[in-house]
Amino acid sequence: MNTIKPTTSLSYLNATGLIPYGMTNDYMFRIILEKNNYVLKGLICSLLSFKPEEVVSVEIQNPILLNEAVDDKEFILDIKVLLNNSAVINLEMQMAYQLNWKERSLSYLCRVFDQLSHGHLYGDIKPAIHIGFLNFDPVSSEHPEFYSSYRLLNEKTYIPYSDKFILRVVNLRQIASATDEDRANRIDYWARLFTATTWEEIKMLAKNNEFIASASQSLYESNADEITREKCRARENYICLERTLAEQETRLAEQEAELATKDAALADKDKIIEKLKKQLAEIQSAN
């Protein structure tokens, strides 16, 4: 697919101010990568250190359905991509802090890896890579990384057990920590595109990068589409409601724990009082 060429008035180049819905909105993230295969190819090339000519095909295996509800738990967050018919890449945009993200990401990766059909050989299993774009530190805030990669290794020798089961994280809060290799692959450019809040930022990023320019145009056109905006708004509302409910559950749990502590303290006091009464009665009886 060729780069989208901006046209006169319908171009991000003429847009100014705040971006209504950026690519950290998981619906916007999905819809742009689904509609613009050129952008999807560019993103995959950056993440996997591929040259564009090395990517023959990138195909989304779980496209969004037009009538699919986006404001419930059944909405599929991850994007399953078949690369060159030889590897499966799972992409996820996750801005809200998830206490169980490590377990959930492993679950996603296992589902992608478990692709063997009946009658096929285990050797036919394609490499599976889950890549999460996060707004939080999933492992440790003491040693923050921008782009981290995890795989199965021998704990003593560090020899890889398999290169077919890989989990990676792009920490959108740690763009400044990007390594020289990350910058050479323009992964920091993609991260800045995803987190951009104004069209002015977008224009600066797109100046010398055709993939970013194409993504910027798709972002502009998607924001101009009423149905897409409604879907993005529905996702934001749902996530906000989900976060509010989670906070309320946390507060209730804290209150219950506090009441339980107070009840335990009162019970201890009652025991002490009863013990003192018994001792006093024994003293009085002795006298």
Functional labels for PLM-detected ranges:
Residues 1-166:
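Accessory alpha/beta interaction modules
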Residues 2-17, 89-94, 192-287:
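Short, charged alpha-helical interaction segments and adjacent helix-coil junctions
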Residues 20-23, 167-171, 193-197:
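Short acidic (Asp/Glu) and glycine-rich catalytic loops that position anionic groups and cofactors
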Residues 142-144, 179-183, 231:
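Short conserved micro-motifs at the rims of enzyme active sites and ligand-binding pockets
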